[in-house]
């Protein structure tokens, strides 16, 4: 089953969670986004990276929720590290209540090597992000300008975020899960 929604100038076919025909299964996403020996920790880290990217681009305020035009890959890397470390500092019972095991995701992130040469191997931090960004680009959600290490969102993602995901209830929920203070 799925929903048909119209946002802005586009029509979206949105699969429900138990849909087996549209979208991606957890295993398909794990295979596309993570290294071949990936565990659930790696998969959840990939989802955390995507959520972090969305929160950095969209703030849920005003007529358009978009807060910025572009982001550098290095800045995204720093945001991921900061958010994971902040999440680990919070109480364990808070982690369990929110359903995010920050320590497990931080462990998976720290297990990835750093490579200043721009390795695209999924076993490096840079390669891990590279594969996630390429996946999002193939889905038409971002433009990834590799030469400049720049990430830009597409009109498709902007419309979807404005009309569906970033109503205030959803936005506050995402911020709470990520541990972001917002007024």
Where are these regions (language model features)?
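Short acidic, hydrophobic short linear motifs in intrinsically disordered regions
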Residues: 66-80, 89-93, 98-120
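A contiguous, surface-oriented mixed alpha/beta subdomain in the mid-to-C-terminal portion of proteins
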Residues: 90-94, 142-144, 172-177
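Positively charged, polyanion-binding regions of nucleic-acid-associated proteins
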Residues: 44-79
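Short, amphipathic alpha-helical interaction segments positioned at domain boundaries
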Residues: 28, 113-117, 138, 157-183
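Short, cationic-aromatic polyanion-contact patches
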Residues: 14-20, 147-171
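Short amphipathic alpha-helical interaction segments
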Residues: 122-138
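A short, conserved structural fragment
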Residues: 1-7, 133-148
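Eukaryotic partner-binding/assembly regions in large regulatory complexes
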Residues: 1-53, 57
